[in-house]
């Protein structure tokens, strides 16, 4: 079995654009990135890793994705199904997920603008 000690992920912090980072593929490092215990969510052939306690700790809203709000920082990793491991995202996945996140961020901005206009 190939060891994926370092993996390339797409990190999304609240109020920031997503960025590509290389992380050590350890539980401790993942917990440090999301500031707590991790929750793993399957998403379009990859995984979203976020803080399991994000809602109970009332972390800062980050992104609305698939009918749920992700709170706090999260990152996306590839799925090595055969070896039950996380792997680097490939270039296609990075491009696709970055586009998806940026489009959702734009929708959220437009919704906020619409609400402000209605209140005036």
Spell out what each predicted region is.
Residues 2-15, 19-112:
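N-terminal nucleophile
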Residues 111-120:
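Non-Sec secretion/translocation targeting segments of pathogen effectors
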């Amino acid at each position: 079995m190939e060891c994926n000690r370092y993996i390339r992920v797409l990190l999304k912090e609240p109020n920031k654009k997503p960025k590509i980072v290389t992380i050590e593929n350890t539980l401790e490092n993942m917990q440090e990135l999301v500031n707590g215990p991790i929750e793993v969510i399957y998403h379009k052939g990859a995984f979203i890793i976020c803080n399991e306690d994000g809602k109970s700790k009332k972390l800062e809203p980050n992104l609305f994705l698939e009918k749920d709000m992700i709170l706090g920082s999260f990152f996306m990793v590839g799925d090595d199904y055969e070896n039950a491991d996380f792997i680097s995202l490939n270039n296609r996945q990075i491009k696709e997920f970055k586009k998806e996140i940026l489009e959702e961020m734009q929708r959220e901005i437009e919704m906020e603008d619409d609400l402000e206009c209605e209140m005036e």
